[in-house]
Amino acid sequence: MSDRNTSNSLTLKERMLSAGAGSVLTSLILTPMDVVRIRLQQQQMIPDCSCDGAAEVPNAVSSGSKMKTFTNVGGQNLNNAKIFWESACFQELHCKNSSLKFNGTLEAFTKIASVEGITSLWRGISLTLLMAIPANMVYFSGYEYIRDVSPIASTYPTLNPLFCGAIARVFAATSIAPLELVKTKLQSIPRSSKSTKTWMMVKDLLNETRQEMKMVGPSRALFKGLEITLWRDVPFSAIYWSSYELCKERLWLDSTRFASKDANWVHFINSFASGCISGMIAAICTHPFDVGKTRWQISMMNNSDPKGGNRSRNMFKFLETIWRTEGLAALYTGLAARVIKIRPSCAIMISSYEISKKVFGNKLHQ
């Protein structure tokens, strides 16, 4: 039985269970690369520590407290691009910037583990699991459902996966946007020692979120960065699914050597390799939006300008500013960590999904 026929014969519940099969595994294995990627991407926003003589301004996180402002190496004032954790960082970490600056993916991985504790690499894992399971269920099952009922499925078979993948990602990304925002913020917070408790960070983060909701409203605060997230995720999905469908048809193992390309283990290898290749291509193409998303979500609005008037609301101008002030390489910060995460993540997720579908399909026809 062909893959498409198997997919058509499965119920929506079975597709969703298939999609959830690999979510736990990928989250447990690959969350550390998410933490490393976010830490690398926020580095240009971290001021060089100069506590002595630094000016104090009201802190948006807690009423009545003070936070210090700094000037970066180039002399540009950072008031309009503060990281939300600045006050907590410079109060509790005592400006130990040695634990904040990294020269690459491997150094970031080892420094975070040694300074903050190995468990810091899995910070936010509960949120990751809480998001990954429903998001992947919506995403994968939604993609196949839309693909199968699409009016252009027969007339434009090459374009159909592209459009269906993009539509499925819009629903999936929007459904988990508030949780993704909280997870990104939580994973970005550094600490100077292993004694700093995660619950303290969560408490400060929730307090900061409440303050921002009062400033700009619940919807703008909780869905902050959704637009640029969609600019990252929708093209990613379009590229991924079109590449995956192409790779799956072209890369299957020689059926003359093996009994059938429908054999479970051959099917697994084909799906794994296709997912790995497609994920890497999509990650490279969309990475500048990932950098922009991280910076946008961890930045804190100026108290005197709740509408964010001093920051461009256009994400393309936002990315262009990063390019002009820091160079093109800044838009690819953390690419290695993201590719290291996405390649096996896509491979494990799609192969688990395909194999689970085959299991359900086999039971259906027994």
Curated annotation (Swiss-Prot):
It is found in: Mitochondrion inner membrane. Disulfide bonds: none annotated. Disruption phenotype: Loss of mitochondrial manganese superoxide dismutase SOD2 activity due to misincorporation of iron into SOD2 rather than manganese. Normal SOD2 activity when in association with YFH1 deletion. Doesn't impair activity of a cytosolic version of manganese SOD. The iron regulatory transcription factor AFT1 is constitutively active. Accumulates mtDNA mutations. Elevated mitochondrial iron and manganese levels. GO terms for cellular component: mitochondrial inner membrane; mitochondrion. It is a multi-pass membrane protein. Solcar repeats lie at residues 14-149, 156-250, 266-359. GO terms for molecular function: pyridoxal phosphate binding. InterPro entries: Mitochondrial_sb/sol_carrier, Mt_carrier_dom_sf, Mtm1-like. GO terms for biological process: import into the mitochondrion; intracellular iron ion homeostasis; pyridoxal phosphate transport. Belongs to the mitochondrial carrier (TC 2.A.29) family. Present with 538 molecules/cell in log phase SD medium. Involved in the mitochondrial activation of SOD2 by specifically facilitating insertion of the essential manganese cofactor. Has the ability to activate iron regulon in an iron-dependent manner. Responds to calorie restriction (CR) strength. This is Mitochondrial carrier protein MTM1. It comes from Saccharomyces cerevisiae (strain ATCC 204508 / S288c).
